A protein has these predicted regions:
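Short, functionally important secondary-structure microenvironments
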Residues: 1-198
């Protein structure tokens, strides 16, 4: 069923959806619509006036990232807030690692899988949204001759297993994406540590 935009505009829909999450977990979420990527950023309590309220910024890429519907992007980023993505612990874990960016991207793939599994289970209509998005993003993955762990995880997550089925450690990466589903807030951290050696 198509939403009547004369009754509820896109902006109102986004604000109301954001408001539900804010109320559910006592958070303040600043919603921005800027160029670039969709993201969720946590602002530590030391920077906040109200120590009982967690503060986040969520950006919804405008124009939209190819293959990602803007409302689906909002639901995904709100999932990071709702399912308590461990922003501070992963930064502490990685510390000053020379591979910080690479490791963080791998962790993020696992964390995205974790939060979307919860959203898909608790809000059944979202499953189709996320599957459609993953498939669209998979079609955008360029073929590679060699497979690093990040590419392998993305290909599996985006329904493009055939591209990496012969990759070294394929089975470990596939298992990791299964193991992280429906885990607690530290599930992606634990799974990340279990595959770091690969």
């Amino acid at each position: 069923m198509t939403r009547n935009t004369q009754i509820l505009s896109e902006k109102e829909l986004f604000e109301k959806t954001k408001g539900i999450v804010e109320h559910a977990i006592n958070a303040e979420i600043n919603l921005t619509f800027k160029r670039g990527d969709n993201f969720c950023q946590y602002h530590p309590t030391s920077e906040n006036k109200d120590l009982n309220k967690k503060v986040y910024t969520i950006n919804i890429a405008t124009p939209a990232v190819k293959g990602i519907n803007k409302y689906t992007a909002l639901l995904h980023e709100l999932g990071h807030v709702l399912y308590k993505s461990p922003f501070t612990p992963i930064k502490k874990l990685l510390g000053t690692s020379k591979n910080y960016s690479f490791y963080f991207l791998i962790f993020n793939v696992l964390e995205d899988q974790r939060i979307e599994s919860h959203l898909s289970e608790n809000y059944i209509a979202y499953r189709q949204r996320f599957e459609k998005t993953c498939t669209a993003l998979g079609k955008e993955l360029e073929d590679q001759i060699t497979f690093d762990p990040l590419y392998a995880l993305l290909a599996i997550r985006f329904n493009q297993e055939e591209k990496v089925k012969d990759a070294k450690n394929f089975l470990h990466y596939k298992k990791a994406l299964e193991d992280v589903k429906n885990t607690d807030e530290f599930g992606a951290l634990r799974v990340f540590l279990s595959i770091k050696k690969y």
